[in-house]
């Protein structure tokens, strides 16, 4: 866009992504004709601070993000920079003091007019600069700079309340290793919070539940015989905390499921990090539960429940149980072999020139779950998941795009994958079917009549219509909700010719492994 005095571009327009080029910086090199040593610049700083009657001057050693206002819309040119490492340099000779919470603010004019001297050792910064035309790489090279006058401000303080309990000791040790160390740290923090987590005049929790999950993941994706990424994550951790106030008859739960706060845990687990994660989240959930309990009491006063429902306890007390389920088979990944499989399967699409966006993706997850509650429910159970997904698209004769996905999942272990020849046949059949859809006419008439369902379509018909809230699954809610199962008591909810049974512990059916089996549920209850 031509400007007054600049009728042609000077070649400074930069862009990344799909934006429009904008004048941007590239390389900035700052030099001085009269360089000084760092010691000389420190003496200048101290001398000027004394002259201005200051007890100290600031030394900014490192800064991080900031923002600028560049005069758009009539605003003043100004900046705000967040220093990372700031020291006070005292004029009386005391050692430099590291401080935090300082922001540097000002305008370019005031800053540049107060630059007094520069150093003799340049430093280089390379990073990314973001603006309306995208993120572009930039480099800045500058020596140390002494500025006689800079305005700073105190960073806005957080309004977070201090935690109820002090943080666990950084030197905490639960002894043991592996599962024993994990349960030991969870147990110590759970007992500490059960005993001491309360504010003055407020109730203590009557129930706590801690969940910790350790997991790692493999992902391999390929297209047309090549691998475009193959990743393996290290072991990672996450968790959850549930805090209940009141008692089993009337508690602070308003959701009746899912009232759990996530726990942030580092990948490197030890007793201290486990305890600290659960300590922080227990405090958060305790304060949340206090608020929720007050809201629930007020709501039930204004909206009393029917006597029969009011008599139901809010929570069932469970017996103590310890169950440690070990992985029946090692979860072993041969990354090279699986990459070769993905290459061969994706290469099959080379014979289908009219198919596009074809790819093959393999995802595998190994996971161990730990749960501990104040009711002495202590559980460990493994989980494995392997999924292979094949997808592609084709342009039909009428110009529309048809996409399809072949999913081979619900596998517990990589060894459960079908043979390469079986997979090749499945992928070839998938591609052939997609090519047939290319020439298939679009149905335009409405139809009411017989239909034949098979494979996944048949099972999906039953799961969607029977195993969902309001069907054969009953959920408790604080307020009446339409379409729930309780509205249908005494009414016909399914065809009498159907028999529905829950085979939770069934490992295999008709020679096919079943992925959903388990011996004990997440609460420690054996399935009926």
Show the residue positions of the predicted features.
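Active-site bordering "gate/hinge" segments
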Residues: 1, 94, 108, 117, ...
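Long, low-charge, small-residue-enriched segments that form tightly packed helices used
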Residues: 1-172, 282, 523-528
């Amino acid at each position: 866009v031509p400007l007054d005095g600049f009728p042609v571009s000077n070649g400074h327009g930069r862009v990344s992504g799909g934006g429009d080029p904008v004048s941007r910086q590239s390389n900035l090199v700052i030099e001085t004709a009269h360089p000084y040593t760092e010691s000389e610049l420190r003496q200048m700083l101290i001398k000027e601070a004394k002259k201005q009657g200051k007890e100290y001057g600031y030394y900014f050693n490192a800064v991080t993000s900031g923002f600028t206002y560049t005069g758009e819309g009539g605003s003043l040119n100004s900046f705000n920079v967040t220093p990372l490492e700031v020291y006070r340099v005292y004029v009386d000779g005391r050692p430099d003091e590291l401080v935090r919470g300082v922001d540097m603010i000002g305008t370019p004019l005031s800053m540049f007019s107060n630059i007094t001297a520069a150093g003799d050792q340049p430093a280089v910064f390379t990073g990314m600069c973001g603006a309306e035309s995208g993120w572009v790489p930039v480099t800045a090279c500058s020596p140390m700079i002494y500025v006689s006058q800079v305005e700073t401000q105190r960073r806005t303080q957080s309004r977070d309340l201090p935690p109820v309990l002090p943080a666990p000791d950084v030197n905490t040790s639960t002894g043991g290793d592996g599962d024993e160390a994990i349960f030991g740290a969870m147990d110590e923090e759970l007992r500490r919070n059960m005993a001491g987590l309360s504010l003055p005049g407020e109730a203590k929790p009557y129930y706590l539940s801690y969940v910790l999950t350790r997991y790692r993941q493999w992902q391999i994706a390929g297209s047309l015989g090549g691998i475009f990424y193959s990743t393996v994550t290290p072991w990672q951790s996450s968790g959850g905390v549930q805090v209940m106030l009141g008692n089993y008859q009337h508690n602070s739960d308003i959701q009746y499921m899912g009232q759990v706060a996530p726990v942030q845990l580092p990948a490197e687990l030890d007793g201290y990090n486990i305890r600290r994660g659960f300590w922080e989240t227990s405090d958060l959930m305790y304060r949340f539960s206090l608020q929720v309990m007050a809201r629930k009491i007020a709501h039930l006063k204004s909206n009393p429940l029917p006597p029969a429902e009011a008599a139901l306890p809010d929570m069932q007390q469970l017996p103590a149980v310890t169950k440690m389920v070990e992985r029946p088979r090692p979860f072993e990944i041969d990354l090279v072999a699986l990459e070769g499989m993905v290459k061969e399967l994706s290469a099959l699409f080379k014979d289908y020139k009219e198919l596009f966006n074809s790819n093959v993706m393999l995802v595998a997850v190994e996971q161990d779950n730990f749960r501990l509650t104040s009711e002495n429910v202590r559980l460990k159970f493994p989980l494995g998941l392997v999924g292979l997904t094949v997808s592609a698209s084709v342009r039909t004769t009428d110009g529309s795009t048809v996409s399809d996905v072949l999913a081979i999942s619900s596998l517990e272990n990589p060894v459960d994958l079908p043979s390469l020849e079986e997979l090749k046949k499945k992928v070839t059949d998938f591609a052939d079917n997609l090519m047939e859809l290319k020439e298939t006419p679009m149905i335009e008439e409405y139809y009411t009549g017989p239909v034949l369902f098979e494979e996944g379509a048949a099972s999906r018909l039953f799961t969607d219509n029977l195993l969902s809230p309001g069907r054969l699954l009953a959920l408790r809610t604080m307020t009446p909700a339409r379409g729930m199962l309780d509205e249908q008591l005494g009414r016909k909810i399914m065809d009498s010719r159907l028999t529905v049974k829950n085979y939770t512990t069934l490992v295999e059916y008709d020679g096919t492994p079943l992925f959903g089996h388990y011996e004990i549920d997440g609460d420690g209850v054996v399935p009926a």
